[in-house]
Amino acid sequence: MGITHELDIFVTNEDLALKNVELFKGNSYGCFINLKVKEEKKFNIIFVLKPDWSEVDKVKPIRMIVNNNSVDVEKVSESLYQVVYSASFSINSDSYVKVFSDNPDKYKHMYPTVTINVPKKKFKVVDQGNTYMFIQSPIDDCDKEQFLKNEFEYYDEENDFDDYEEYVKNRNDSFDDY
């Protein structure tokens, strides 16, 4: 039947999700990203790989090159269902990013290509390659909760309880008026 991994890439500081970046079939994953910037900008990227364990017993690590410079990609967590990686880098001019598990030149015609124009807040899939890739913005709340807890602060847990107590008190006070 063939190997079918799943790969999602989250560009957290731009609130973008590159979804279904995996190939239709095959033990390779990656994409090319054209980044347009007008000033220095730091990017934080989270990769979520859901391996097809029925066909492989270990996954290839994700690697990244930005403007011909290697970027450290750190494995954050690994479970039976997924492997999560993260990477950060800064650029001060338009840049070309390669994300890959195998030689990106070999898969150039298969990996998707995306353009993200940061100043204009525009993005598009330039070439879908052999994927069903799409871009989601903003990042879905379920994905934020599951993978990006440290990147997005939803609430302050200490204040949640206080706010709830205040809500109940106000609600009960309003019932007294009737």
From Swiss-Prot:
Entry's Gene Ontology BP terms: viral process
Lineage top rank: taxon: Viruses
Position of the signal peptide: none
Pfam family membership, one: Pox_C7_F8A
Biological role: Plays a role for multiplication of the virus in different cell types.
Family: Belongs to the poxviridae C7 protein family.
Protein name: Probable host range protein 2
The species this protein was found in: Yaba-like disease virus (YLDV)
